[in-house]
From Swiss-Prot:
A family per Pfam: Spermine_synth
HAMAP family from the UniProt entry: Spermidine_synth
Assembly information from the UniProt record: Homodimer or homotetramer.
The protein, known as: Polyamine aminopropyltransferase
Organism for this UniProt entry: Lachnoclostridium phytofermentans (strain ATCC 700394 / DSM 18823 / ISDg) (Clostridium phytofermentans)
EC code: 2.5.1.16
Gene Ontology BP terms: spermidine biosynthetic process
Main subcellular location of this protein, as a coarse class: cytoplasm
Catalytic EC class: transferase
Domain annotation PABS: ranges: 2-237
Annotated pathway: Amine and polyamine biosynthesis; spermidine biosynthesis; spermidine from putrescine: step 1/1
Catalytic activity reported: S-adenosyl 3-(methylsulfanyl)propylamine + putrescine = S-methyl-5'-thioadenosine + spermidine + H(+)
Binding site for S-methyl-5'-thioadenosine: 31, 106, 137-138, 162
InterPro entries named among the record's database cross-references: PABS, SAM-dependent_MTases_sf, Spermi_synthase, Spermidine_synt_N, Spermidine_synt_N_sf
């Protein structure tokens, strides 16, 4: 008998992967956490039935959410990461010796424990001495912070359930206050392709542009995500993601990456027309 995991991309679209086995299933205080082993995509993290990351293509997501701002801002030392319980974003950040401190805020401690055991390819740097973990709501943690961070990365799940508060104008306003005068905010921006998701893209972009003087969107292709077309938000108090890109400096670091490069960096901000139209009234 064959086993298949099916991710519901929309009410009319599904994405199925042939499974080897279910490795673990845990019901935390906030959600159900599953890790499955698949033939094509390796290990897969599933929250409340929704696919979050896969072993095969997680590197795309984590490199794009991390290295884009790191190649723009000239002096990132203190970083706040909200979400990221799987550890992939932390793994990418710890490649930079210049980063001095990372606050990681994850509401669900159980995700971290499960990923440490079953997804070491993303959780491998959670014990880095520069990382401080805080198990609480990101919205609550950032509230009241003033002028503390060079970079904030919002690496959260979809805009419902435990992560819903991380897509509000109040949250983005608090992030603005928590950043230094030249700080950058990066958030995962969902997919613009399906109508069921495009409203979330518009809403997040509207809230961010109301707060930050410079706000734009960049894209990448993640095969296991709904439609494969995924967006990230880049919001900044000072730096332009293309004009202020220091490709020479970044390339001299010779970091081990599989997807991101500085040529791709320049191109990922050039959006297709349908995305421009979707976001146009808020640019």
């Amino acid at each position: 008998m064959e086993l298949w995991y099916t991710d519901q991309h929309t009410k009319d679209v599904r994405f199925s992967i042939k499974m080897k086995e279910q490795l673990v299933s845990v019901e935390s205080e906030f959600q159900r956490i599953d890790i499955i082993e698949t033939y094509e995509y390796g290990r897969v993290l599933v929250l409340d039935g929704e696919m979050m990351i896969t072993e095969k293509d997680e590197f795309i997501y984590h490199e794009m959410i991390t290295h884009v701002p790191m190649a723009v801002h000239p002096n990132i030392r203190n970083v706040l990461v909200i979400g990221a319980g799987d550890g992939g974003t932390i793994r990418e950040l710890t490649k930079y010796d210049t980063i001095e401190h990372i606050d990681m805020v994850e509401v669900d401690k159980e995700i971290v424990q499960v990923c440490r055991e079953y997804m070491p390819f993303t959780a491998c740097k959670l014990n880095d001495k520069r990382v401080s973990m805080h198990f609480e709501e990101g919205l609550r943690f950032v509230r009241g912070k003033q002028d503390e961070y060079d970079l904030i990365i919002v690496d959260c799940a979809d805009p419902f359930g435990p992560a819903e508060g991380l897509f509000t104008r109040e949250f983005y306003g608090n992030c603005y206050k928590a950043l230094h005068d030249d700080g950058i905010l990066i958030n995962q921006h969902e997919s613009p392709f399906y109508n069921e998701h495009s409203g979330s893209v518009q809403k997040a972009h509207r809230h961010i542009t109301a707060v930050f003087p410079l706000s734009t969107v960049y894209q990448c292709h993640i095969p296991s995500y709904p439609s494969g077309h995924w967006l990230f938000g880049f919001a900044s108090k000072k730096y332009d993601p293309i004009k202020d890109l220091n490709d020479k400096k970044w390339n001299e670091l010779k970091l081990p990456v599989r997807y991101y490069n500085t040529d791709l960096h320049k191109g990922c901000f050039y959006l297709p027309n349908y995305v421009k139209e979707l976001l146009g009234s808020y640019e």
